[in-house]
From Swiss-Prot:
Its EC number is 5.3.1.23. It comes from Desulforudis audaxviator (strain MP104C). It catalyses: 5-(methylsulfanyl)-alpha-D-ribose 1-phosphate = 5-(methylsulfanyl)-D-ribulose 1-phosphate. One of its GO terms (molecular function) is S-methyl-5-thioribose-1-phosphate isomerase activity. It is an enzyme of class 5 (isomerase). The record marks C155 as: Transition state stabilizer. InterPro entries: IF-2B-related (IPR000649), IF-M1Pi (IPR005251), IF_2B-like_C (IPR042529), Initiation_fac_2B_a/b/d (IPR011559), M1Pi_N (IPR027363), NagB/RpiA_transferase-like (IPR037171). The active site is at D235. It holds the Pfam family IF-2B. The gene is mtnA. The keyword Isomerase applies. Belongs to the eIF-2B alpha/beta/delta subunits family. MtnA subfamily. This is Methylthioribose-1-phosphate isomerase. Substrate binds at R46, G47, A48, R88, Q194, N245, K246.
Length: 348
């Protein structure tokens, strides 16, 4: 069974600590919005939809800590949302979820007690809707999967990265549930090893055939093994269809184009940012140099070496075969298709 990345119980948020996988399955307790912010910042939880859900519940935790009259309560909520929003800048779901939560608070009549109840209901709706969206993506996307299929994926876009079921891995799950034979090649995804630690673990739990490969093997893998497709998730999609995803995605898209292999991005509409016109306008998070210079606490690079460690890159829309969304499969040109899909299929 797919694992839960997060759940709410008795006024607390429980987050699966993904930094400890695959060795340990441990949930950390978030009792305050600061705990939720720390879980996001330290990548105990990661993946754009999952980050959005944790941010939403983080605002609920903040509301439970906040008193005063209605106006002071709303002002404090905005401050807490700012703290949560600043944890990771690239994944747009976090900002989207927080804006949705704040809008729900403003439109709810009554004093703080009523607002707290409304916020909890909204956070639970965000989780429920994400799972439903992922399952719809799976149904749309599985039609693109041949039988049998040899698939390369990158990072982790499964149940661990979402409220449940997954985006890219959700499509693979749906194909498997439809009786198709799939073999997945999981890129290790340096430097945080989400592919090695998380994707391989998820797929093995469900009995889906998976082969772990080093990131720098991708070109040779495509030339040697005759892949049927590459499928990844996304942390933000610009209005023109450019996609920000885990560092290394752009390289895979270039290689896929060179080898004539379809390159698909599975993404819920909550990850589409129509306010960002093109990919180069997407803010790219840069992380701690120690993620490259150290491995499990041990230095593996010379002391004092310069490090550049962007967590994401941007894949131009012209390298993308299709966007698999919860509103259907979108083909290029993506601009108008995204505007129509968001306008008809997403709650703002």
């Amino acid at each position: 069974m797919p694992v839960e990345a997060l759940y709410w119980k008795d006024g607390r948020l429980y987050v699966l600590d993904q930094t400890r996988l695959p060795e340990e399955t441990v949930y950390v307790t978030c009792s305050s919005y600061r705990d939720a912010a720390e879980a996001i910042k330290t990548m105990r939880v990661r993946g754009a939809p999952a980050i959005g859900a944790v941010g939403a519940f983080g605002l609920v935790l903040g509301a439970l800590e906040t008193g005063g009259d209605r106006e002071s309560f709303l002002a404090r909520l905005r401050e807490i949302a700012g703290v949560l929003r600043d944890t990771r800048p690239t994944a747009v779901n976090l900002d989207w979820a927080l804006e949705r939560m704040l809008a729900r608070a403003v439109e709810t009549l009554g004093e703080p007690g009523a607002l707290r109840a409304a916020l909890l209901a909204e956070a639970q709706a965000i989780v429920r809707e994400d799972i439903e969206a992922n399952r719809r993506m799976g149904l749309f996307g599985r039609e693109l999967i041949p039988d049998p299929a040899r698939i390369l994926t990158h990072c982790n876009a499964g149940a661990l990265a979402t409220a449940g079921y997954g985006t890219a891995l959700g499509v693979i799950r749906a194909a498997r549930e439809a009786g198709k034979q799939v073999k997945v090649f999981a890129g290790e995804t340096r430097p945080f090893l989400q592919g090695a630690r998380l994707t391989a673990w998820e797929l093995m739990r469900e009995g889906i055939e998976v082969v772990l490969v080093a990131d720098n093997m991708a070109g040779y893998l495509m030339a040697r093994e005759g892949l049927d497709l590459v499928i990844v998730g996304a942390d933000r999609v610009a209005a023109n269809g450019d996609v920000a995803n885990k560092i290394g995605t752009y390289s895979l898209a270039v290689l896929a184009r060179a080898h004539g292999i379809p390159f698909y991005v599975a993404v819920p509409l909550s990850t589409v940012d129509l306010r960002t016109a093109i990919g180069r306008d997407i803010p790219i998070e840069e992380r701690d140099p120690a993620e490259l210079t150290h491995f499990r606490g041990r230095r593996v690079a010379p002391q004092g070496v310069a490090v550049w460690n962007p967590a994401f890159d941007v894949t131009p829309n012209e390298l993308i075969t299709a966007l698999i969304t919860d509103a259907g499969v979108l083909k290029p040109p993506f601009g108008e298709a995204l505007r129509r899909a968001v306008g008809s299929g997403r709650r703002e």
